Amino acid sequence: MNNNFNFSFHTSYKFILIAFCSCCINTATAFYKTDPNDTTPVSTQKDAILFIEKIKQLESSAYWPNVKPELFLKNLKENIYTPLSLYEGSNTNFCGYAALSYFPLHDDPLGYAKFMLELFYKGKAKFGKVFIQPSSEILKAAGTLKFKGILDIRPADQVWFLCLADHFKGYVNFFNKHYDEGDENTFWASVNYAKFNRMVKQLFNYAVNTRGYDLMHPHINDLYGYISDKMKTGTVVLYLNNAELYKKKHNTLRPATPTHYIILLGISRTEEMITMTYWDYGFRSLRQITPAFFKKIIFGISCCTKKLSHE
């Protein structure tokens, strides 16, 4: 095959692929505008409390042999009463799943509680557009994770994190798609940026506006101004280099890649410093950093907005 023909073939192939993707995107957009039922499910903490307090005791599940029902119910109630207490666990790669948990626990805790109880009783359940049916390895693993801090005694969170990691796959999971003991701290559990945004859309039906990449910083001139504006319209998730944010010795070389998701709760700026308040799984954090360092650590900005009406 000569070079001219080879170039022509690959150019045509790329054009067809781009055209097909464009068609899919336009079709999806049109559907969103015409479907009156395409809204984000919402409920209140009071709704969830009234529901969960009617349940005094759970029987053991035939599907989750290592999950103690009394601890499972206790964990659910803790998440509903104090949603910011949810914790990814020590030495795990569950941070992406912990971060997205902010959405159901704050905006649809009743939907979350019903899903978790159905998953416990039936071994499978549907959340939003996603049908979750965990593998046999996950059914056996939940309730057995050890040396993960408070996650050791929070089996509902173990079920939630393991099921999400088992169901959703991104390119970072390509070489390890099936769970083996200890995989909660390997690439099996990792969450790349596109995978995170896809989970928020499919599970909770949010409109997600994104800027960023896995390996490059977003090209935004006024990063602080952009993020401040996005906070006025929705919940902002920052995808950042956690090693840089928390390193103690600033002369230590660190890999310049993002590893962590945080929920931004507040942001302000003076001439020399930017102050961030954010949820970092288990507690609120407050950090003051320079604008240059702020730009250095951020790789992705996702603004997640509830679909409440259609224009």
Predicted regions and their residues:
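Bacterial Sec-dependent N-terminal signal peptides
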Residues: 1-32
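Active-site nucleophile-adjacent alpha helix/oxyanion-hole segment immediately C-terminal to the catalytic cysteine
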Residues: 35, 40-176, 231-237
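Solvent-exposed loop/turn segments at secondary-structure junctions
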Residues: 95, 102, 243-246, 284
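Non-catalytic membrane-recruitment/adaptor modules and adjacent regulatory linkers
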Residues: 150-182, 187-190, 237-242, 271-277, ...
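Hydrophobic, aromatic-enriched interface-forming segments
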Residues: 174-220
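Active-site-adjacent substructure of cysteine-protease-like catalytic cores
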Residues: 211-273
